[in-house]
Amino acid sequence: MAWGPFNAGGGGGSSGGTAADISYDNSKSGISAANVQEAIDALSVLTLTIQAVPAQSGSLTYTGSTQSPTWKGYDSSMMTIGGVTSGINAGTYTATFTPIGKYVWTDGTQEAKSVSWTIGRAEVKNVPAQTGSVTYNGSAQSPSWSNYNSSQLTIGGTRSATNAGSYSATFTPTSNYKWSDGTTTAK
């Protein structure tokens, strides 16, 4: 009684598992069908280790539209993804990865691992400047500003005045923007 090879893994899929060939040849003493079944049973409890928790690959910058990161090391045949997997605004988000089936992390668990990912602030290239002039007329007046977009910047300081003179306004990037030098404070 001889058995041919038995493939106990892989199956041609892309799960990253390793196939093991088991065969039985009754010409060797001490090997029985029970021994082969024990080997098969041992293989059925094998776990496959995921070597690294996925991480954000590349960077995202605020666009005003929904974005999702590309993940280095993510394979849907080995794990599920959950948590926050897409966002619109600049900031930090948290996704989770959980092994499925026979897959485990290097610590031997199938616990969900949290991974932070980010959308960076978009850049405001120029500080606004007053365009034209304002002449005293007895009423409160506000200047016009070049390069000012209220969705990108808030305006502070003296925004309007009645009397002749020099005044200072300040501009601060909103939460999705930064100055071209990387700062977010008023200028």
Task: Name each region found by the language model.
Residues M1-V45:
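Short, low-complexity N-terminal tether/leader segments at secretion or assembly junctions of large
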Residues L46-K187:
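Solvent-exposed beta-strand/loop surfaces, strongest in extracytoplasmic domains of secreted
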